[in-house]
Amino acid sequence: MDISKGLPGMQGGLHIWISENRKMVPVPEGAYGNFFEEHCYVILHVPQSPKATQGASSDLHYWVGKQAGAEAQGAAEAFQQRLQDELGGQTVLHREAQGHESDCFCSYFRPGIIYRKGGLASDLKHVETNLFNIQRLLHIKGRKHVSATEVELSWNSFNKGDIFLLDLGKMMIQWNGPKTSISEKARGLALTYSLRDRERGGGRAQIGVVDDEAKAPDLMQIMEAVLGRRVGSLRAATPSKDINQLQKANVRLYHVYEKGKDLVVLELATPPLTQDLLQEEDFYILDQGGFKIYVWQGRMSSLQERKAAFSRAVGFIQAKGYPTYTNVEVVNDGAESAAFKQLFRTWSEKRRRNQKLGGRDKSIHVKLDVGKLHTQPKLAAQLRMVDDGSGKVEVWCIQDLHRQPVDPKRHGQLCAGNCYLVLYTYQRLGRVQYILYLWQGHQATADEIEALNSNAEELDVMYGGVLVQEHVTMGSEPPHFLAIFQGQLVIFQERAGHHGKGQSASTTRLFQVQGTDSHNTRTMEVPARASSLNSSDIFLLVTASVCYLWFGKGCNGDQREMARVVVTVISRKNEETVLEGQEPPHFWEALGGRAPYPSNKRLPEEVPSFQPRLFECSSHMGCLVLAEVGFFSQEDLDKYDIMLLDTWQEIFLWLGEAASEWKEAVAWGQEYLKTHPAGRSPATPIVLVKQGHEPPTFIGWFFTWDPYKWTSHPSHKEVVDGSPAAASTISEITAEVNNLRLSRWPGNGRAGAVALQALKGSQDSSENDLVRSPKSAGSRTSSSVSSTSATINGGLRREQLMHQAVEDLPEGVDPARREFYLSDSDFQDIFGKSKEEFYSMATWRQRQEKKQLGFF
């Protein structure tokens, strides 16, 4: 096969090939996400511009089905190698095994992966055609990354901890195990809808959900007609095999080289790893706790070594006794994945050619423009600034485990022995928003820290649960926190008195001033001795009679200007400027005599070049479990989830409005930092963000953001339980199901008869379980339209329906579906689409259009 002819080049997107008769053939796009167990696949993902992160690599995956033979594997391996040769060194290679795919791989297929029986590529036709004469049972597993596997059509396949989908062509019944979480149910439902929409001609199938068997007798009757009567109890839930963060933190780096005819694998280092351990002429294996094996190839390594990368990784896996399905990722020098880079303490893109100036480096010296920060979230995220700090500020000090207000005159004067709450109020695009900073002093007690959190919760309740909460550790204050106090943040090494005043422990005190403007200056008290000095900074030495301003040789004019602002906060005594090297004797006497101190010029702090990463959080047996979401977008934020966004300088924890474990969020963030293989600082700020109240510093990390995305979506409970928000659609479903033709029902006659009889049962019982099918929206029960049957045929006039109060509508018109009574021509004219097209859209999008056009 001529690879170059079939190669999509660097065109962005996803491209998939399947093994067939010892060769690889393209998979039609409509079949993406479906994998046949007796085949191997090659998947190429090329980042799409402008979404792609600058310098992002392509990913090339080799996927092996559980039943794949040697011929299929050989064809896929050879094809992948030839693709790699065509693409060059900017490609990350992956080996994937069915049921154990990497997070990167799973991120391509939303809402889930379908594993199918069969071994012929012709089976792909089953994915693309609209067959309704089908009976199959799918076992659905997973939280963020969902998969569905075809299993035996029997009750023996069921267990209490998973979700099962009985697909009968014209009807799909999702059975939720009693031990499944609300998040798993919602994800399962999303996959069910996706299957229905892709495989049933855009949605021509009803969906039923069994959450409680006792409350869904009709659906259970259908299931028993197909599966037979269940004998005995269900199997217990299968224990989860999730890999927790402690396991992932067990990282070891090995140097792999040849010595004569032997291959030597030498353990080189354990965390924290540094980038300089990797030499460009060598070959390395990085073992992440047996969970994943990375192979790093230096740019000067031999062609033979690079071609042997996978075989060496497989040999390493066998030697370690790891499972054969262990994931393998091969990265090239200069094209490392984000996951690989974050296994190292720091990572510099020193080898990247013609690198443009990064947003943060370029912008940090630019004067802040509040308007741009409000309208350009990406800039706000890079600078970590929601505005210039000129909003309203309220401060409380935690004393006697309660919050005490701090006099505004003393705002910005914090004590290391205390904890503080700082509430910042600002406006963005006409909307009031809040940030609550939880500042923790180094000398604060455990009880005070606990009181800090409980008082923050009380404030959040007082403000209706809309506060963004940022946990800040003394000395690691984020830029916006510093900007709030306009360069006058001073941290005293003491405890605050009951009136918010510092209780002085000494008459001689030394303060270090660091910063060049009102947005980055911090002043901290340090031990009053000569060894605390540093030539790069300015120090204020306060004695009983005078306040010395000591200017180190490495400081500049901006630093001196800020020091003169700070000195007015610290002391009212006479000021005396002292240049390094020209100190009077009394200066050294106050410090207890001369002593060595750092005198070399401080190098600029290097800004880490790590890409942001998004994870779904959960826990297993008390340990944090993360599932990474590659190529993330706002669509990946689900109301039932807690998501962790790691931007390296901050950790955001996004709390979905229906998340059940939100109280664990901060602890999860702390555990994430503690167990991170790169040895992250535990003082990294942790920010709690509530769904619907995201600040621009969070929004800016997403390519696009829709602030109204969640305003019209029905909840999972509304959909399943038939709450008022979905009640009007349930009768429509019942009406359509009542009109199903027995001849179109799949399976034998008895099953069809039982199913039809069950579905013709009382509407009361089905209302709790049947989920709306968009195609059914044009149907009505006879009782609901009897009074308007005459006018429906011709349609009501638009002025009778648009912008009308409920009491002003014609008799018999359903207020929730008033648009339905328009004539077909009026409907097309107003909505720009036919009724069939309109009712095939998602419910929330229908509501949105109806609101805009006056039909709500």
Curated annotation (Swiss-Prot):
Pfam families: Gelsolin, VHP. Ubiquitously expressed in 16 tissues examined. Gene3D superfamilies: Severin, Villin headpiece domain. Residues 790-856 form the HP domain. Residues 762-796 are annotated as: Disordered. The keyword Repeat applies. Signal peptide: none annotated. InterPro entries: ADF-H/Gelsolin-like_dom_sf (IPR029006), Gelsolin-like_dom (IPR007123), Gelsolin-like_dom_sf (IPR036180), Villin/Gelsolin (IPR007122), Villin_headpiece (IPR003128), Villin_headpiece_dom_sf (IPR036886). GO terms for biological process: actin filament severing; actin polymerization or depolymerization; barbed-end actin filament capping. One of its GO terms (molecular function) is structural constituent of cytoskeleton. Gelsolin-like repeats lie at residues 22-74, 146-186, 263-307, 401-450, 521-561, 624-665. GO terms for cellular component: actin cytoskeleton; cytoplasm. Keywords: Actin capping, Actin-binding, Calcium, Repeat. Residues 776-791 have a biased composition (Low complexity). Belongs to the villin/gelsolin family. Possible tumor suppressor. This is Villin-like protein. It comes from Homo sapiens. The lineage of its organism: Eukaryota, Metazoa, Chordata, Craniata, Vertebrata. The gene is VILL.
